[in-house]
UniProtKB/Swiss-Prot annotation:
Motif placement: JAMM motif: 171-184
PANTHER family: DNA REPAIR PROTEIN RADC (PTHR30471), UPF0758 PROTEIN YEES-RELATED (PTHR30471:SF3)
GO molecular function, one term: metal ion binding
Record-linked NCBIfam families: PRK00024.1 (NF000642), radc (TIGR00608)
InterPro entries: MPN, RadC_JAB, RuvA_2-like, UPF0758, UPF0758_CS, UPF0758_N, UPF0758_YicR
Keyword annotations of the record: Hydrolase, Metal-binding, Metalloprotease, Protease, Zinc
Pfam families: RadC, UPF0758_N
Superkingdom assignment: Bacteria
Stated name of the protein: UPF0758 protein YE0063
Length: 222
């Protein structure tokens, strides 16, 4: 079996054990394919993830920040952006084909992929049809590292624009801890009241942390 960097090559490891056992750096190394003089591709992958703080930090970095790294040019930047876009489209297409209530795990993974590593609080709304399939999702409000101000009327206006019958609310906690605050619960109540005037249901509010997601519906708070 081929070895890289003193260990089993990521591609060989993937073929033998499956992609799920690979680390973030190993998966990235498969996409990058080659390193640079003096730095093996595995070392390069590990360095990039460490430099940007996380895999999400890496794939969401802009062109200037990424290309400032030695060995990263247009080609590797394009590869990294393609990874991010493919992942997003995969989740989106899956969500749009079935009711989100039938597969809550996919919904939570989708939201974690988008929100879990953001440095500011982001309030996202998923707009659903009458069969609870996703019409579209939108990051509606951006806050600070510890709070986000929302406007229920804007959410209702957007829901009417796309003819949504129901919503799923979501926001992240940059601290990494997903436990909802009293402010989160009050915010949810305000949105529910505004939506109920037009018979739009709020099915859930998900608070996203790092590696965890808390559902208001599962806690019986709606």
């Amino acid at each position: 079996m081929e070895e890289w960097y003193g260990q089993v090559a990521p591609r060989e490891k993937l073929l033998k054990y499956g992609a799920a056992v690979l680390t973030d750096a190993e998966l990235l190394a498969i996409f990058l394919r080659t390193g640079i003089p003096g730095m093996h591709v595995m070392q390069m992958a590990e360095y990039l993830i460490e430099e940007f703080g996380s895999l999400y930090g890496l794939i969401s970095a802009d062109y200037q920040a990424l290309c400032a790294q030695k060995g990263i040019g247009v080609s590797k930047y394009s590869q990294i952006q393609a990874i991010a876009e493919l992942a997003g489209r995969c989740f989106s297409s899956h969500l749009m084909q079935e009711s989100v209530l039938q597969n809550p795990e996919i919904t939570q993974k989708f939201l974690q992929n988008i929100l879990s590593h953001r440095e500011r609080e982001i309030f996202l709304v998923m707009f659903l049809d009458n069969q609870h399939r996703v019409i579209r999702h939108e990051e509606m409000f951006t806050g600070t590292i510890s709070s986000v101000e929302i406007h229920p009327r804007e959410i209702v206006r957007e829901a009417l624009k796309v003819n949504a019958a129901a919503l799923i609310l979501a926001h992240n906690h940059p601290s990494g801890k997903a436990e909802p605050s009293q402010a989160d619960r009050l915010m949810t109540t305000q949105v529910i009241k505004a939506c109920s005037l037009l018979d739009i249901r709020v099915l859930d509010h998900l608070v996203v942390g790092r590696g965890e997601c808390v559902s208001f519906a599962e806690r019986g708070w709606l």
